[in-house]
Structures are given as structure tokens and as C-alpha cells.
């Protein structure tokens, strides 16, 4: 199926920790530079881009020379707080090589639930984009909680990216993953797994293949991505799920190349 993005102007790109931090725990500088080049190239074409970036914990562990994530929530939040500063500092440095200015927006769920604060953050996005600035969004891990009477966490940045796409009325959400897209079953286990090129509806079969009950596909956080795709559908949007190994593939996708899985209703 031919994909047409000629009229796409506003894009949300979500990048996960696995695309920013190597398995050794070291920061993947080359990958971040490639991503900065691609995003800057899109902005130079006149597109508006919002980057939703995980990685605060990974950066914090690297900075603090810690081998593994701490168990205590307060310590996790402290490490993420340190990592967020380091991550934004690196983003600012690398994007400056391409004359791209960046900003930071840290969100909690209550900000987008209450109408007044939602309007404020919406205005902030619009102002930044109108000024040609790249908003870099993450959850405010240092203060987010998930208590029954005061839930402020989004859950993960897959969901956050779908929320950002909704409130900014983005034309397209591009979700970079460590897998090529949505398969009919786990490709790490089954050699005959088939990549789904196009998904027009989130069916029970797709939910099962992505990690639901009785699934063959139990790893990789794919279910969270499918739930995010449903949120995109609910807002009449479209989404690409693709491998983030080579960020320059984003340019190919926008040129219509059949890369990853394209989530679009009735297309």
C-alpha cells in the first residue's frame, strides 16, 4: 500500500532508551547525532517536529556509574533527575551543530487532564513551533507518582507520545523502536513471523499478537505501542512504528518507502 505524506507538516517522533543508550550502558552518540541531523533536515524543509525522548534513567545510570536501576522509587527519581539534565545538555550541544534550537517540556498526566493547564501547555507547544524551536518532551520522572488517589504518571513514553500527538494535533506520530514494526508473532522466537505493513484497525488478534492474554509475543513492550496506536486512531491520526537503528530511515518513510508498520484507518 502506497503511503502518502506529501501534506504532512507536524510530526511527533518518539525515541526510546534502547535507541539512545547502548547495551553496555554507554550513550550512543552516533545515533543521537544521526537523529539530530534527520530532525533538523525536516525542520529545514518547513516541517514542525516534536521529539518525545526517553532515556533519563539510562543517562543517569551512566553519569552516576551505576550498573543497574535502583529499587527504591525515590532513588529512581533522583537518578532520572540527574539523567534528564545530562540528556538535555547533550541534545542541546548536538542539535546546535545543525543550528537547531531545542527546548524542554516535562509533563505529568495531571497537566493534560485539567483544562487550564492543558491550554497552557498547548500554548507553549504552539509558541515554540511557531518560533522554529524543537520541543523535547519527557515525563517529569522526578515528581511523577502512581498512587491510587493521585495518579500523575502516563505509564510510559509510548502513551505520552500519543498524548502529545493529540494535544498538538500532529499529522503523524513516528515511533522508533528496537524492532522493525508489528509482527503477527514474536520474530525473536518464530522464524516465520511476518511483518504487518499496514494496520487499519486494532483487532483482538492484533492485541494478542502484541502481548495480550494467550500471546506468543510477550516481550518488547509491543502492547503499549498498540494501545498508543489505538489512542492515535481515536483522534483520527496516523502512526508509523519502525526500527530506530538508522534514524535516516525516517526520511525514506516520509518519501513513501514501505518501512515499518503503518497505522492508518481506512487508508
From Swiss-Prot:
ATP binds at residues 14, 177-178, 219-225. Substrate binds at residues 54, 141, 157. InterPro entries: AceGlu_kinase-like_sf, Asp/Glu/Uridylate_kinase, G5K_ProB, Glu/AcGlu_kinase, Glu_5kinase, Glu_5kinase/COase_Synthase, Glutamate_5-kinase_CS. GO terms for molecular function: ATP binding; glutamate 5-kinase activity. Its EC number is 2.7.2.11. It comes from the Bacteria. PROSITE patterns: GLUTAMATE_5_KINASE. GO terms for biological process: L-proline biosynthetic process. SUPFAM superfamilies: Carbamate kinase-like. Pfam families: AA_kinase (PF00696). Belongs to the glutamate 5-kinase family. Catalyzes the transfer of a phosphate group to glutamate to form L-glutamate 5-phosphate. This is Glutamate 5-kinase. It comes from Streptococcus agalactiae serotype V (strain ATCC BAA-611 / 2603 V/R). The lineage of its organism: Bacteria, Bacillati, Bacillota, Bacilli, Lactobacillales.
